[in-house]
Amino acid sequence: MVSINIRPDEIGSIIRKQIEEYIQEVKVVNIGTVLQVGDGIARIYGLDEVMAGELLEFEDGTVGIALNLESDNVGAVLMGDGLTIQEGGSVKATGKIAQIPVSNAYLGRVVNALAQPIDGKGQISASESRLIESPAPGIISRRSVYEPMQTGLIAIDSMIPIGRGQRELIIGDRQTGKTAVATDTILNQKGQNVTCVYVAIGQKASSVAQVVNTFQERGAMEYTIVVAEMADSPATLQYLAPYTGAALAEYFMYRKQHTLIIYDDLSKQAQAYRQMSLLLRRPPGREAYPGDVFYLHSRLLERAAKLSSQLGEGSMTALPIVETQAGDVSAYIPTNVISITDGQIFLSADLFNAGIRPAINVGISVSRVGSAAQIKAMKQVAGKLKLELAQFAELEAFAQFASDLDRATQNQLARGQRLRELLKQSQSAPLSVEEQVATIYTGVNGYLDILKVEQVKRFLVQLREYLVTNKPQFGEIIRSTKIFTEDAESILRVAIREYTELFLLQEK
């Protein structure tokens, strides 16, 4: 029989060593219980230390956001249908506020409000992440807007100019071409080093597919990210989509780049937020919207900025879209967004139906940045245009009652009709600055007066082609100097004269 020699001191030292090496890891998890769930809302008991806006994880993997922190329960909105969440199920607080991955790899992709790809082209690699709700740049971080953001639409670039870092509202009834103005602006950024983000909120999947298709055909997807939450998405995701778009645009803005973001449209986001708020039993205010619906939009649109030179002079230009009912601009959401933005482009159903497209009502559209956002060449030719159109609108109303008009009035009416014709443009056909300058110069200096009104559009299209092929130096001068010099003017005058003769011969 072998005797085992037990040495207590050796065993003691082993035990002591193990005790010293033992690291006590206590994982504290904040857990609650589902009291009630339905309509995209869950009431949870027991989440004591949850933050406002914190992400919560349910047993089935659904994620929610804690919005209502009440004395006895927490109201959370779900980012999914929540059909498999059961009463009494457990909920875990993640300790995180909603954030999304960001990187250059997002360019050319279609993603949802959680920045997950929905275009079937595989995962997007990203090493960085940004909070969906980031604070807007402060006063010291900004500088005033001074560079133009060309939309390619004559009516806007000449009379309601938009600058980089501005927020310009596009407002009008449904089916007046609001999305067309926004998408044309994206198409016009080709080769301008501007990253675009198009956020579609609560739209038909077919409309979004059509927009994406246009971008792909015209090569605009290379510099564009589409964030889409369709009409059948949960209200929570429709509410988050614009903030996700803003976070993606901010990533590029803080990297010294210029960005353009379009929110299409904020009325639907406000409706989704109203639905969430009413289901959370928050008290309704005007038009049943909650009291903080102004803050919903102001904290989003204040993130658009022109950054100071210390921060690299990046910019984020926002074009929010708001839909009106029967042209009523004094409803709650339209007045809110008008008061937040730096101007608005008003699209009118009457003009649209009369065949004036883009249907921009120049009389009540404004840009509060003004000519600071125009190149000198455009200022030189466009000054007269707005005045002449305003006088024409006044005269036209007056001329309906008067039967015998003097010669000067008739001439002014004829000029006005031709100028209105000059502002018409086909969809997805944005014009470069030099083409716009040539077009406006032709109109305000009376070179169109000898043509019939129905010939004007055709004449201008062909004149622009003639300039490109026969007088390329005109475009070069405008592009390089950004000034409508005397040389440019004389080249343009000769070109107009030569082409008018050709055109009139063809017409005969």
Swiss-Prot record:
Cellular location(s): Plastid, Chloroplast thylakoid membrane
Keywords: ATP synthesis, ATP-binding, CF(1), Chloroplast, Hydrogen ion transport, Ion transport, Membrane, Nucleotide-binding, Plastid, Thylakoid, Translocase, Transport
Coiled-coil ranges from the UniProt annotation: none
Cross-referenced InterPro entries: ATP_synth_asu-like_sf, ATP_synth_asu_C, ATP_synth_asu_C_sf, ATP_synth_F1_a_nt-bd_dom, ATP_synth_F1_asu, ATPase_a/bsu_AS, ATPase_F1/V1/A1_a/bsu_N, ATPase_F1/V1/A1_a/bsu_N_sf
Gene Ontology molecular-function annotations: ADP binding; ATP binding; proton-transporting ATP synthase activity, rotational mechanism
PROSITE patterns to which the protein is assigned, alphabetical: ATPASE_ALPHA_BETA
Membrane topology, record value: Peripheral membrane protein
SUPFAM superfamilies, per the entry: C-terminal domain of alpha and beta subunits of F1 ATP synthase, N-terminal domain of alpha and beta subunits of F1 ATP synthase, P-loop containing nucleoside triphosphate hydrolases
Site (Required for activity): S365
Chemical reaction(s) catalysed: ATP + H2O + 4 H(+)(in) = ADP + phosphate + 5 H(+)(out)
Enzyme Commission number(s): 7.1.2.2
Enzyme class: translocase
UniProt-annotated binding residues for ATP: G172, D173, R174, Q175, T176, G177, K178, T179
General function of this protein: Produces ATP from ADP in the presence of a proton gradient across the membrane. The alpha chain is a regulatory subunit.
NCBIfam families for this protein: atpA, PRK13343.1
Listed PANTHER family: ATP SYNTHASE SUBUNIT ALPHA, MITOCHONDRIAL
Assembly behavior: F-type ATPases have 2 components, CF(1) - the catalytic core - and CF(0) - the membrane proton channel. CF(1) has five subunits: alpha(3), beta(3), gamma(1), delta(1), epsilon(1). CF(0) has four main subunits: a, b, b' and c.
Family stated for the protein in its record: Belongs to the ATPase alpha/beta chains family.
Protein name: ATP synthase subunit alpha, chloroplastic
Source organism per UniProt: Psilotum nudum
The gene coding this protein: atpA
